């Protein structure tokens, strides 16, 4: 009997051990699958740059004759790099060690310059056209804005740190150049932070920065020393959206003050002007404050890119350029609707005919990495946007020729976020000098194509999947209005795929994109 019990017990223990082993192995396999899936989701597509120099940035640059000139040559590659510029017009000086061009813009005309960057590995050259004339922002402006990271917590030190990181992270090396303050740099009459409370104007009517910004000119100078540009914010109303001092009835004083401080970009936000306009919703009422500031900016001896922000009222894309603005918001703050990036982009794309060099539709900032919640203006936290949608987000903004302003915490940039922000071939699509905004075709509930003509005769094509499962998406030559053999290049991975004759089909990740360039094969 005892032997029988021992045998049964031994068999039972063996069975239990086997079951435990199977459960453990299954759990480990499932965990591995989950981990691998997560790793795949956060796959970095942008190749690492080599040690040799590679010049990036726009091929054409607009500026006004006789005004101060500042341009940092965007260039990847191991430092030190020696820069040179053949046929640089008189009045401009290149620092060969930093690649920063300064001076006074030459007389009206087009100036073709050959930029060169050389280090111990190799040399790169690029044609760069300076167009001295009436137009600025001949390609969509690129930079950083503090709002969706820091809201009313912004300080002078944070702005300087952002400028430092724009250089050290490599963002400036692919073309990001503006470091922009949004709301909350001035005084308010009431605020939870006592250092932001004080008189809004001095006895002469000059606007007073709050105590977190002790030296506005010093801040702009600090940014300029790095070859970058400084942006500022105000409202045509008496108060900004956050309740700080606006520019109402002090427009000329403020415009001149911004220029004296050395700012290069102005965001002009409707905010409390709605109380001034009252019930008047006529086109003239919408235009009035923006025309006034636009005329003032054009009268200054400084190039200031003008960003008109009033959320698309009165079909602003139809008349924004009349005010002298270089870009205009086409919708409400995107921070409240980050789950609707596709909807916002598709609506913005409907206005593509109004987008051209010096005149850009602006669907708001790129919000990835660490961002604050728009509703409660909370501290930055990792974005909840799926990685595949982050690739789609950047691809959409590039295809639409939208201004590229990152608005996340610069101090928490990670490799994945920088891979999204700093792919130079994706940015080339955004900065293409033809200035076209992409055309949406073959649109259904689950997928669509966005097609953009490029200056060299090729086309950038985004194959987008809005669904929650991966799917095959096809671009046929007849839809793209191309014919014959085409070299298909994966723009994110920066590699040629194959030569095709009549269509391109690919599996697109859920909520994601495959972004390609189609170049005729001779």
Language-model features and meaning:
Residues 36, 53-80:
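Solvent-exposed, low-complexity, repeat-rich "mucin-like" stalks and linkers
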Residues 35-53:
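Proline/serine/threonine-rich low-complexity linkers at boundaries of modular beta-sandwich domains
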Residues 391, 397-400, 405-407, 442-482, ...:
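Carbohydrate-binding surface patches
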Residues 499-522:
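C-terminal beta-strand-rich structural cap/linker in extracellular carbohydrate-active enzymes
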Residues 73, 109-121:
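A short beta-strand micro-motif common to beta-rich folds, especially ectodomain repeats
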Residues 91-107:
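Strand-loop-strand motifs at the edges of beta-sheets in extracellular beta-sandwich domains
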